[in-house]
UniProtKB/Swiss-Prot annotation:
Taxonomic source organism: Oryza sativa subsp. japonica (Rice)
GO function terms (MF aspect): calcium ion transmembrane transporter activity; manganese ion transmembrane transporter activity
GO CC annotation: Golgi apparatus; membrane
Alphabetical keyword list: Membrane, Signal, Transmembrane, Transmembrane helix
Annotated PANTHER family: GDT1-LIKE PROTEIN 3, TRANSMEMBRANE PROTEIN HTP-1 RELATED
GO terms, biological process: calcium ion transmembrane transport; Golgi calcium ion homeostasis; Golgi calcium ion transport; manganese ion transmembrane transport
Name used for this protein in its record: GDT1-like protein 4
Topology of the protein relative to the lipid bilayer: Multi-pass membrane protein
Length: 282
């Protein structure tokens, strides 16, 4: 009897052990599946984060490409505008005539300093205007200005006598230079800081450029194009034109047909007007 009881207890104990082992085995099999689900979820989250980062980087790259295109577009527009509007202009002739009587390096440095200051002021004014007036209105104003200057230049090219007008303009500039010879008070005040020749070149160039069509066109360009591109392009254009004027002197100015320059400039300004009208900034 005692042996039967002990045998029964032993069987019950074995059954309990077997049940516990089976439960443990089942738990071990469920854990990997749960871990796999968690791992898959973590992998999905990482994949989404990677895709989001990749899209963001692609968007940033696209934005940089657009900014680069805007910079080069403004640069070439400003450069071409200055080249066709400044060759043979009053500032061009001033630099050419002064270089015939004074050291070329001094005349060039004074004229370029004035033109750089004028370009920075014009570009800054062009960036301030859109903050005061809506971008749509500034673009419309720029379109009208481009068309006005283009038609005006074409009218000048059609009506003017190239040789007579060029000779008259040179005589007017010579009169201004001769009139400025007697005014030495301004020179004496600043003689400690700048040489009289540098100062004369700077002041004459600055006053001749103020209100000129190239300054107004620079302001108009800066209202709807990249300001850095406009400033760099205009500065490079002024540097090229003024360098030609200083090196070539009046000989180069007298051989360039003002009618041809006015025609090219008029067509270019009309092209700017059409581009601004049909492709306005966003």
């Amino acid at each position: 009897m005692a042996r039967r009881v002990s045998t029964t207890r032993l069987l019950l104990l074995l059954l309990l052990v077997a049940a516990a082992a089976a439960a443990a085995a089942a738990g071990d099999q469920e854990d990997p599946r749960g871990g796999g689900d968690n791992g898959t979820a973590r992998l999905d989250r990482r994949t989404k984060m990677f895709l989001h980062a990749a899209r963001a980087s692609d968007g940033g790259a696209t934005g940089m490409e657009k900014a680069g295109l805007g910079l080069f577009d403004a640069f070439f527009a400003s450069l071409s505008m200055i080249l066709v509007s400044e060759i043979g202009d009053e500032t061009f002739i001033i630099a050419a005539l002064m270089a015939m009587r004074h050291p070329k390096s001094t005349v060039l440095s004074g004229a370029l300093s004035a033109l750089v200051v004028m370009t920075i002021l014009s570009t800054g004014l062009g960036r301030i205007v859109p903050n005061l007036i809506s971008r749509k209105h500034t673009n419309s104003a720029a379109t009208v200005l481009y068309a006005f200057f283009g038609l005006r230049l074409l009218y000048i090219a059609w009506r003017s006598d190239s040789k007579a007008s060029q000779k008259k303009e040179i005589e007017e500039v010579e009169e201004k230079l001769e009139a400025g010879q007697g005014k030495s008070t301004f020179r004496r005040i600043f003689s400690r800081f700048c040489t009289p020749i540098f100062l004369e070149s700077f002041v004459l160039t600055f006053l001749a450029e103020w209100g000129d069509r190239s300054q107004i066109a620079t302001i108009a360009l800066a209202t709807h194009k990249n300001a850095v591109g406009v400033a760099v392009g205009a500065t490079l254009g002024h540097t090229i034109c003024t360098s030609f004027a200083v090196v070539g002197g009046s000989m180069l100015a007298s051989k360039i047909s003002q009618g041809t320059v006015a025609t090219i400039g008029g067509l270019l300004f009309l092209g700017f007007s059409l581009s601004s009208y049909f492709y306005p900034p966003l």
